[in-house]
Amino acid sequence: MRKYLTVAALGILLTGCGEKSDFEKAINEKISKNGVCYGFSKENNAKVVEDFRLGTPVRVNIYGRDDVDPVLIGLKNTGFLNISYEQEMFKRVAILETTDKGRNTKFWDSNNGACVGHRAVAEVKSWTEPSEGNGVKMTQVTYTWRLDGVPGWVDKKAFSGVKGMVEPEETKIVLVKTNNGWAAR
């Protein structure tokens, strides 16, 4: 009898682990697709990007209340960029210029800009019991993520303002059960 109870308990335990790893896989498929990057808007052409990489200053509009993206702050803190500001009528403009150190490091990718890694699940912390709703089976998962694939030129202390660089960030996501397993929506 003890043998059967031990096998049953082990089966239940392994089922929970399987679900947890399935959740992690589904979340990673969603959150790791795009890098954590700073780039120019799509209207800037290849010539502007190449000139910037060679040291020509580029003017970038700053929208909203935030002064500057945390990736830009990290690039400035590392000594790869000089950033100055001007006010133009009703908008603020940042003037970005690569330094000698920045040009030698080649931190800028012409397609994506400066990327400091991508999000990856650090830990699946908890989830709701999967339930039916609107004809689908779903669950809400609480997890932490951190930056993964961080390039060698990134000084984590200089980029500490970028979420997930130093400490994992906690968030929630809804997963839906499909014929191919769990998927993030």
Model regions: which residues?
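Short beta-strand edge/turn micro-motifs at domain boundaries
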Residues: 82, 140-147, 164-185
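Post-signal-peptide N-terminal segment of Sec-exported extracytoplasmic proteins
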Residues: 35-67
